[in-house]
Amino acid sequence: MENENRDEMIIKQQREIEREICEAIPLVSQLNEIGSLNDEYENDEVYINKIKDLQTKYRYMRRTRPDGNCFFRAFAFAYLEYLGKNTHDYISFRSLAQESKEKLIKLGFPQFTLEDFHDTFMEVVKKFDPAEISLDKDMTEELSLTFNEQGYSDYVVVYLRLLTSGKLQEEADFYQHFIEGNFTIEEFRHQEVEPMYKESDHIHIIALCSALDVCVRVEYMDRGDGGKIKAHDFPEGKEPKVFLLYRPGHYDILYPNK
Amino acid sequence: MSTPARRRLMRDFKRLQEDPPTGVSGAPTDNNIMIWNAVIFGPHDTPFEDGTFKLTIEFTEEYPNKPPTVRFVSKVFHPNVYADGGICLDILQNRWSPTYDVSAILTSIQSLLSDPNPNSPANSTAAQLYKENRREYEKRVKACVEQSFID
């Protein structure tokens, strides 16, 4: 028995589960009312109260596919949506993104494959130049199309993962303190950051926000007491541009009340 | 039809031709870019020296986000190679990074031949001999090297 190829059997089973999720949930959904969350938590007092609290601050949400890439995908969608309406921030982001390739190559990432991801990433970024977009509605539709096309959507996720990994490497002495278990930064990057479908933790969020110089607010909704959801800004003290809902193991996009 | 996976495989192939790493080669099969044949030459100063080991690499449309399935076609006696030719190597499983290309895959397998990991055995006999009876291990490896000339 021992010499059977168990790795391939496990991989095959994982792929079947993933296929079922793919068929059920789009990569990024249309806008849903926050109230639609109630359907998932019938008769569940704790969550129902927290959804009420969430509604005092947010009106809509977009669900993302729970494939382990949800943080990166949700972040990219929400941030590009913000940038598409904010010329000043868009311009500085675009030049930061443009220059990031050289920086990652200097950190030792393989140039040949990095270029492939960077080219696609920049192609997507350029689509959402506020100067090129006349209507909010057009932009949102274009974002939905782009992010539901697996090729583009996944390449954007990969590039964000590489930026995150690069930041961890660049400031390894700092991030080493946040790593649980016996991982070195090197092992953590290769095992938990760069591979697709690996879930994100605080450390991924902190490193990505720092690499892109942006603040993300995450609203935590779990079984904890108090009936209120808890917000956490990464990093603290800056104005958040991206709003995400966290439920254990998963991130979705939130839209604040205007 | 051009898809991200196919475009990337064309690039991988171009790079492998223009900048071939020592001791490995690979190319898509005649009518399907998703299935490649490859050869790894046994690294010098190892019992695999002089062997020419054939492999197949099968990609899916999810490449490079997911690793391909790589398998030895030639018989290989090695702690991390299964009887069916499947390879137990972390970068082909849970440590796969989309930044790896065909060239990186083949050179990683080549290094695995030189440096087996007997703690995660796919072939328990090979792993045990590697740890406890290196002479017998090398004898068995050399037998598969000779076999590789005939294949």
Curated annotation (Swiss-Prot), chain B:
Free-text disruption phenotype from the record: Lethality during the second instar-early third instar larval stages. Mutants show defective synaptic function as a consequence of mitochondrial failure.
Catalytic activity of the protein: S-ubiquitinyl-[E1 ubiquitin-activating enzyme]-L-cysteine + [E2 ubiquitin-conjugating enzyme]-L-cysteine = [E1 ubiquitin-activating enzyme]-L-cysteine + S-ubiquitinyl-[E2 ubiquitin-conjugating enzyme]-L-cysteine
Entry GO MF terms: ATP binding; p53 binding; protein domain specific binding; ubiquitin conjugating enzyme activity; ubiquitin-protein transferase activity
Pathway linked to the protein: Protein modification; protein ubiquitination
Function according to Swiss-Prot or TrEMBL: E2 ubiquitin-conjugating enzyme that accepts ubiquitin from the ubiquitin-activating enzyme E1 and transfers it to a E3 ubiquitin-protein ligase. Required for postreplication repair of UV-damaged DNA. Involved in the negative regulation of the Ras/MAPK signaling pathway in the wing by acting with the putative E3 ligases poe, Kcmf1 and Ufd4 to mediate the ubiquitination and proteasomal degradation of rl/MAPK. Required for in mitophagy.
Family membership noted in the UniProt record: Belongs to the ubiquitin-conjugating enzyme family.
Name listed for the protein in its UniProt record: Ubiquitin-conjugating enzyme E2-17 kDa
Organism listed in the record: Drosophila melanogaster (Fruit fly)
Gene that specifies this protein: Ubc6
